[in-house]
């Protein structure tokens, strides 16, 4: 079994990705098979470069390097209440370091941290733990602006 993510576009599956870093405290390694790092990649949807880190994978900076240059990074997750601050801090750091938008989507279950957010490449956060849906318009110019202003070689 795999912990698998599906990305849909125009009613079609355009990408699947299996989790590579299984969470040991959740005994995921007993139930799932880890995938390979090479499976983490940037995909193109309508000119947007999109990448995904699944849950616990957020904690591994070597994986951040793997998705360098993505415009949007997705992070579906189930981080617990005790690690809420970690989740929010690491998600913001990912946006700043990779100069990309991050969509951090954490479980809203009562035992989970919530903390879902849309984070801009400048680190600005759209977040509301009381909402079930967050939405924002992405401006690719904002990505280009930060990458030009603070040039770390991502253009």
Each language-model region and where it sits:
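Generic structural detector for well-ordered beta-strands
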Residues: 44, 135-137
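A short acidic/small-residue loop/turn micro-motif
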Residues: 20-23, 131-135
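Short acidic-glycine loop/turn motifs at beta-strand connectors
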Residues: 8-12, 119-122, 138
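CN hydrolase (nitrilase-like) catalytic-core segments centered on the catalytic cysteine
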Residues: 59-134
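Long, non-catalytic architectural segments outside compact domain cores
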Residues: 141-143
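Active-site catalytic loop in hydrolytic enzyme cores
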Residues: 1-68, 83-85, 89, 145-154
